[in-house]
Amino acid sequence: QVEVVAQPNWKTLLDNVINGDLDGAHMLSGQPIAATIGFGTKAHIITAFTMDLNGNGITVANSIWDQMKENDPELDKDKPKHPITADSLKPIVQEKLDEGEKLQMGMVFPVSTHNYELRYWLASAGIHPGMYTKTDIGGRTDAEVELSVTPPPMMPATLEAGNIQGYCVGEP
C-alpha cells in the first residue's frame, strides 16, 4: 500500500526521506546526487528513474516584462519569437546595479534544474548569476542578480509582493 503525503517544500521532502519519515519520494533530479556527495546534507540516496521532461519556464514581473519590451521591440508583438533570451534584461540588471540594488529572482532549490536553467539563461546574456565556491554554497559570489530559494506554491504571491521580480519553475 502506498500513501501519498504532500510536503511543503523540497528541503522538507529531502529531510523526511533521509530521516525515514518517507520511504521514497518524487524529488528534484539533483537532490539524490547532491545528498550523496554531501552538498548541504550528507546521505546516500539512490534514484530509480528520472521523470524530467524539461518543462520549466521563466516568468518575470509585468513591470520587468514592460521594460524588456522597451529594450527589444520584437518582444512587443502578439507572439514574440521564442525562445526569449535575457538580452533585453541585461540593461535592467545594470540599472539596478547602478542604483546599488540587485534584481531578485526565485528558483525552487539550489540543486534543481530550475536553478541551473535560470543561471544559464542569465549568463547567456552576459548577466553574471553568481558562482559556487567552497565557502559559498548559495552561489552568490560575484553575482549581478540575487537568486533565492522560493517554494513553488509561494512564487506568484512572492512576485506580486515585489520580493522577487522573476522566477523559474516547472509543473510537477
Describe each model-derived feature in a short phrase:
Residues 1-151, 157-172:
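Short, glycine-/small- and polar/acidic-enriched structural segments
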